[in-house]
């Protein structure tokens, strides 16, 4: 896994990103694995709870599908793509702190079968563009 650092934040180069600090890893069968970025988890600090997306729910790109709760704040989880939620990371219900420890790996949040991938993929940010966003914000 190649990574780039922006100050104390890590951005991996093997995935795409959103303006709302989610990451997306796409597979050949249009299934996307989605989580929140290192930048997002460090801003939230100690994550204490999560409301996971509803399995088999059809969602639109940009729709709020869940909530992450930290000692400091609550933040919506947005779906970066339209499609159907096919899997959620139930481990996070008992151990939401995994997101703090490993946001890009064990801390993945949900998987989605994308329905409009070709048109929506263009709206996602490359690692370089996401770094520009972090530097600007």
UniProtKB/Swiss-Prot annotation:
SUPFAM superfamilies for the chain: Single hybrid motif
Single Gene Ontology BP annotation: glycine decarboxylation via glycine cleavage system
Cofactor note: Binds 1 lipoyl cofactor covalently.
Sites of N6-lipoyllysine modification: 72
Cofactors demanded by this protein: (R)-lipoate
Assigned keywords, A-Z: Lipoyl
Domain Lipoyl-binding: 31-113
NCBIfam families in the cross-refs: gcvH, PRK01202.1
Assembly with partners or alone: The glycine cleavage system is composed of four proteins: P, T, L and H.
Function: The glycine cleavage system catalyzes the degradation of glycine. The H protein shuttles the methylamine group of glycine from the P protein to the T protein.
Protein name, as recorded: Probable glycine cleavage system H protein 1
Natural source organism: Saccharolobus solfataricus (strain ATCC 35092 / DSM 1617 / JCM 11322 / P2) (Sulfolobus solfataricus)
């Amino acid at each position: 896994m190649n990574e780039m650092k922006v100050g104390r934040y890590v951005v991996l180069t093997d995935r795409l990103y959103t303006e709302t600090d989610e990451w997306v890893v796409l597979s050949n069968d249009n299934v996307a694995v989605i989580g929140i970025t290192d930048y997002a988890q460090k801003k939230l600090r100690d994550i204490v709870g999560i409301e996971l997306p509803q399995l088999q729910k059809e969602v639109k790109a940009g729709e709020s599908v869940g909530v992450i709760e930290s000692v400091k704040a609550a933040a919506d989880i947005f779906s970066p793509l339209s499609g159907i939620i096919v899997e959620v990371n139930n481990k996070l219900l008992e151990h939401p702190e995994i997101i703090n420890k490993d946001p890009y790996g064990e801390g993945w949040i949900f998987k989605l079968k994308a329905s409009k991938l070709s048109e929506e993929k263009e709206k996602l940010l490359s690692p370089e563009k996401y770094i520009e966003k972090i530097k600007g914000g």
